[in-house]
């Protein structure tokens, strides 16, 4: 990644958008470097994109984060920006505090990689005496919502914070399998009424941007984790892949087909062999 030039990031974003469209993805939630090149690709294609910052000890600064927040949110009606940082284990205390201050200033949700690995959570508890979720709560980052990507190694108090703050957990099953991170406790989120969404994660940790594959893995892994084939209904999984994601990205005008909503929709050809017979 350190060798990627601006043009590389631009054209790789174009390639990613093309792959998104092949599996019916109408918008993406992107945390990456060289974001002005990423946003140029989405503006040129007209693809709906929500960016969030990957701020950490090695990339960007609070000043760049604030600049991008104001720039992208005024750029187009198909682009928006939410505050965020890469992860607790890559981001020092002063930077975390700066994100919390910006969240208060702009009344913005905050996003980060959260409890993806067991070692990540253990390290955070050694440094702060808290899990990543509890640390963000103490710093005041969740006053205006947000959530976390992965959310595998969660504790009881973490679930309470997600429920009470109306946060979203984004599960990334292919990535979690490839990196042997663990399996998201999806049913516990679901039973607590916490909003859930499904993500693909990045190409380095997935190799594929196929939402239908992610839906299958999301339901399959949850069933195995709970040893319950009926643990989460299929319509709930579909909700996570559609409206759940829209709510996570603050795209509340794209969450369902209704009068006055944006017409973000896909068509599925029911005449293809894999879609027959329709009755079962």
Name what the model sees in each region.
Residues 1-46, 66-75:
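Alpha-helical scaffold segments that flank or form the walls of functional sites
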Residues 53-58, 116, 173-177, 202-204:
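Short, acidic/turn-prone active-site loops that include or flank metal/cofactor-
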Residues 156-157, 163-194, 198-200:
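A conserved active-site cap/scaffold subdomain adjacent to cofactor or substrate pockets
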Residues 37-152:
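Metal-coordinating catalytic core of metallo-dependent amide/deamination hydrolases
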Residues 25, 47, 107, 166-167:
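A structural motif
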């Amino acid at each position: 990644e350190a060798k990627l030039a601006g043009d590389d990031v631009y054209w790789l974003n174009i390639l990613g958008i093309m792959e998104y469209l092949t599996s019916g993805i109408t918008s993406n939630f992107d945390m990456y470097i060289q974001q002005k090149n990423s946003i140029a690709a989405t503006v040129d294609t007209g693809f709906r994109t929500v960016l969030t910052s990957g701020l950490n000890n090695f990339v960007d600064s609070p000043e760049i984060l604030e600049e991008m927040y104001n720039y992208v949110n005024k750029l187009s009606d198909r682009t928006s920006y939410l505050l965020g940082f890469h992860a607790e284990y890559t981001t020092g205390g002063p930077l975390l505090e700066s994100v919390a201050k910006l969240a208060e200033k702009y009344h913005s949700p905050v996003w980060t990689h959260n409890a993806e690995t067991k070692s990540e959570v253990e390290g955070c508890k050694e440094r702060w005496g808290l899990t990543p979720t509890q640390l963000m709560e103490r710093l005041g980052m969740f006053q205006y919502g947000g959530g976390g990507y992965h959310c595998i190694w969660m504790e009881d108090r973490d679930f309470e914070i997600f429920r009470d703050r109306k946060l979203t957990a984004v599960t990334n099953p292919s990535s979690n399998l490839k990196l042997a991170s663990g399996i998201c406790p999806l049913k516990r989120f679901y039973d607590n009424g916490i909003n859930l969404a499904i993500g693909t994660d990045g190409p380095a940790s997935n190799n594929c941007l196929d939402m239908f594959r992610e839906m299958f893995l999301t339901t399959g892994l949850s069933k195995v984790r709970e040893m319950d084939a009926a643990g989460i209904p299929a319509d709930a999984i579909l909700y996570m892949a559609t409206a759940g994601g829209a709510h996570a990205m603050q795209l509340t005008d794209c969450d369902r087909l209704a009068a006055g909503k944006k017409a973000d929709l896909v068509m599925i050809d029911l005449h293809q062999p894999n879609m027959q017979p329709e009755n079962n």
